[in-house]
Regions:
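Surface-exposed, low-hydrophobicity beta-strand/loop segments enriched in small/polar/acidic residues
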Residues: 2-147
């Protein structure tokens, strides 16, 4: 399975961004494909524009690993210039998706990231699912953004 882009990442579906000091919740749908992800695949989520800070984020995932010993794990962060890997990792070793659940930022790496330039945010699959069960399921990433 190759890496995928969300509709927000590709500009097909708008990503809401704040135009003032209020915090705006911006939702990014994650449509899981029929084919299983393998290690190092990327789910390119969205671009946070320059001048906008991410104050918090959550990722809500369905159960995408139905194996008796689930293995699915991922990281989240900013893509490198080529869009081929994470250059800045906000969090790693995340296992949400082994069972349905919510992952919420547990450190401030996303908040401390420079807002001087656009940041392309992605999830990187670090361990493939033991038994992939994501086909046709949808998750969501919610970025709380502030201008």
């Amino acid at each position: 399975m190759p890496s995928i882009n969300t509709k927000q990442y590709d500009g097909i579906k708008p990503m809401y961004t704040p135009d003032a000091a209020e915090v705006c919740g911006s939702h990014v749908d994650i449509d899981f494909p029929a084919a299983a992800f393998v290690a190092n695949d990327l789910i390119r989520l969205a671009t946070i524009p320059a001048g906008v800070r991410c104050v918090d984020y959550k990722v809500v995932l369905p159960d995408v690993d139905s194996g008796g010993s689930p293995a699915f794990a991922w990281s989240i962060g900013e893509l490198n210039a080529g869009g081929t890997d994470l250059a800045t990792v906000y969090a790693s070793g995340i296992t949400t998706g082994q069972a349905a659940g919510v992952y919420r930022a547990v450190n401030s790496a996303h908040f401390e990231a420079s807002a001087a330039a656009d940041r392309r945010i992605a999830m990187k699959i670090t361990t493939a699912a033991a038994t992939y069960a994501g086909s046709g399921k949808t998750g969501v990433a919610v970025f709380d953004l502030q201008a």
